């Protein structure tokens, strides 16, 4: 397949999905966050999607690392616990979440897709472009963790989960840019759940951007896309057995292979830490058999000690022009009266011609706790009675506008 794009001003985005292995409750390896920090600092993703996140404290720790080591512009979506019925196992301690560079993406909304087991989490991101009002470009990022284990019963449970997603996506505009990242726990592209995702009759049809379809389980021909297990040694948590499965994926909608507004960068998809060495089959990634030129021993050590999965990475590109950062306009809006508030925050908008259609309130960890649509009125009374006491920042959706601080 040949993919070509015209030569315009281009912006590149780096994406990573990672199964965090019960973070932070899995403690067999001490100080695991240090190993994750090394991995994130090595790749420096613009969007970081995760599963097996146990709680909000783990999410906050990851956000702090991203802000300290990569960019203070990093934000996270609101952490939500699993809401699905969960009738087939106690998995309410395994959550999904997304982190993103707020100078490049604006979180427009987040939604939950319930299934019989675990939620799909849908995060609608908008490119922070100069023409985002007149011609917005949206990326729908969906993060998942399908039912694990082999056997026809588990295959059917995975299929039922994916069918719920298909139904949810049936209402999307057919030209939507959609990305599905997750631990699919599938053993072959012929498995019913995977076939459901790539069904050409669906409203949104997914593709494997690296085009490595096949029967992956214990098949050395696909060692380059294997993501589990990083380990053969027991006692570290998670699965052992060495590198012999492709469980982790980032799929894109078919239009992202060709559309110039937002598209997959050819040859950018990787199992991060996998040197595509056939000798690594069934070995742990620290083994000399797993050596190669792409990923050093130091990089592989960090991955080995943090999780039994390897992350999956890829890049997207756009031809739209992003807003230059930072060129702050501090007089665009202001807090009226004192910034010490109890129940109501009064805000005056001085300039609505700044590609802004919302205000966002963040806590000190950079998490969005409230969004406020902007109408025609220049004066807003914002109810903050539901917020906990503490320091907050309010910002226009246009990140060129300096955020304002208030205390509740």
Give the location of each predicted region:
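C-terminal outer-membrane/trafficking sorting elements
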Residues: 327-408
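Short, solvent-exposed secondary-structure boundary motifs
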Residues: 293, 323-330
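Generic marker of residues within folded, mature protein domains
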Residues: 5-8, 89, 113, 131, ...
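Divalent cation-coordinating acidic motifs and surrounding scaffolds
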Residues: 10-321
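Bacterial Sec-dependent N-terminal signal peptides
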Residues: 1-12, 322-326, 367
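N-terminal compositionally biased, intrinsically disordered segments and leader/signal-like regions
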Residues: 5, 219, 228-235, 331, ...
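Intrinsic disorder/low-complexity segments
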Residues: 3-6, 250, 265, 382
């Amino acid at each position: 397949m040949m993919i070509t794009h015209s030569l315009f001003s281009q912006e590149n985005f780096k994406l990573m999905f990672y199964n965090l292995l019960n973070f932070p409750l899995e403690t067999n390896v001490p100080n695991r966050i240090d190993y994750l920090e090394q991995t994130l600092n090595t790749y420096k993703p613009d969007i970081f999607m995760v599963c097996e996140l146990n709680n909000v404290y783990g999410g906050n720790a990851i956000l702090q690392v991203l802000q300290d080591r990569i960019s203070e512009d990093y934000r996270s979506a609101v952490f939500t616990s699993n809401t699905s019925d969960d009738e087939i196992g106690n998995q309410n301690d395994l959550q999904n979440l997304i982190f993103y560079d707020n100078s490049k993406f604006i979180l427009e909304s987040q939604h939950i897709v319930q299934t019989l087991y675990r939620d799909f989490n849908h995060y609608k991101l908008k490119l922070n472009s100069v023409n985002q009002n007149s011609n917005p470009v949206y990326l729908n990022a969906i993060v998942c963790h399908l039912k694990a284990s082999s056997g026809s019963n588990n295959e059917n449970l995975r299929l039922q989960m994916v069918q719920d997603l298909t139904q949810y996506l049936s209402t999307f505009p057919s030209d939507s840019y959609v990305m599905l990242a997750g631990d699919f726990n599938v053993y072959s592209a012929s498995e019913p759940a995977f076939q459901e995702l790539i069904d050409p009759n669906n409203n949104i049809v997914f593709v494997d951007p690296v085009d490595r379809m096949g029967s992956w389980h214990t098949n050395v021909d696909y060692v380059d896309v294997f993501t589990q297990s990083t380990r053969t040694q027991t006692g570290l948590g998670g699965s052992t057995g060495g590198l012999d499965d492709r469980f982790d994926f980032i799929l894109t909608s078919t239009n992202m292979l060709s559309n110039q507004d937002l598209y997959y960068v050819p040859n950018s998809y990787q199992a991060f830490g996998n040197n595509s060495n056939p000798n690594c089959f069934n070995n742990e990634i620290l083994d000399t058999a797993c050596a190669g030129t792409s990923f050093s021993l130091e990089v592989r050590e960090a991955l080995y000690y943090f999780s039994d999965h390897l992350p999956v990475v890829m890049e997207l590109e756009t031809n739209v022009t992003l807003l230059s950062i930072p060129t702050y306009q501090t007089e665009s809006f202001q807090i009226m009266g004192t910034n010490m508030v109890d129940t109501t925050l009064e805000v005056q908008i001085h300039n609505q011609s700044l590609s802004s259609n919302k205000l966002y309130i963040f806590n000190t960890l950079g998490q969005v706790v409230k969004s406020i649509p902007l109408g025609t009125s220049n004066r807003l009374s914002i109810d903050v009675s539901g917020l906990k006491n503490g320091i907050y920042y309010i910002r226009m959706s246009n990140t060129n506008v300096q955020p304002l601080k208030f205390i509740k």
